[in-house]
């Protein structure tokens, strides 16, 4: 019985990982409505992904230097179809793991939490540092 519980516990905490190419997006989208209903802010730790529900918390690691950033999925993009990328990071998130001039980087993407995933936020809310922290409460314990 204890062994089964241990195995189940381990499976629950195994994160889903994928390897992909990432880029960033910023000033041209500043203040505009994102696909999730939030107003985009380039200075917040967010990303655009077509593969994960809004509100999913991801750990994105630059494979070249092993620097990581924790981001929240708040947008979608046409980058996959046009350019073969899996994720676009906010300018702030990208600068945490690479120099802006690099443009495209190879990353590992891990799902950390889907506990606060959502369909759409009405009323054009602004995603703030306080809101970011609220998405991380599940993983901070």
Which role does the model predict for each range below?
Residues 10-17:
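Hydrophobic core
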Residues 5, 17-141:
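Secreted/periplasmic proteins
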Residues 2-9:
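Sec-dependent signal peptide recognition
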């Amino acid at each position: 019985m204890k062994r089964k519980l241990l195995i189940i516990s381990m499976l629950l905490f195994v994160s889903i990982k994928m390897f992909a190419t990432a880029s960033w997006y910023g000033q041209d989208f500043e203040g505009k409505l994102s696909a999730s209903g939030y107003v985009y802010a380039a200075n917040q730790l967010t990303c655009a992904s077509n593969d994960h529900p809004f509100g999913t918390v991801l750990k994105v690691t630059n494979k070249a230097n092993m620097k990581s950033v924790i981001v929240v999925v708040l947008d979608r993009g046409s980058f996959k179809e046009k350019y073969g990328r899996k994720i676009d990071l906010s300018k702030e998130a990208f600068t945490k793991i690479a120099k802006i001039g690099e443009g495209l980087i190879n990353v590992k993407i891990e799902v950390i939490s889907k506990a606060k995933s959502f369909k759409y936020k009405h009323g054009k809310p602004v995603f703030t540092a306080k809101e970011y922290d609220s998405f991380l409460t599940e993983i901070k314990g």
